[in-house]
């Protein structure tokens, strides 16, 4: 696993762990980067967080949810047990 893949995997794990602990949480990609990922991994690159969200979305662990003009991300069916 190269450095970029490792950073994405670490960001994805931080997001997954947060949603397991707070299953009703929903946040923008920017908020996820700042509040959920940065404190755990030190990752500051929004592109890495976006890649992690895309990976988790493919797995059904997160889903985008449009609220007005913004997209929030929340736990997907794989984390909600459905």
Roles of regions detected by a PLM:
Residues 1-26:
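Short alpha-helical segments that sit at the start of domains
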Residues 25-37:
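Short acidic, hydrophobic short linear motifs in intrinsically disordered regions
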Residues 57-67:
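A short, conserved structural fragment
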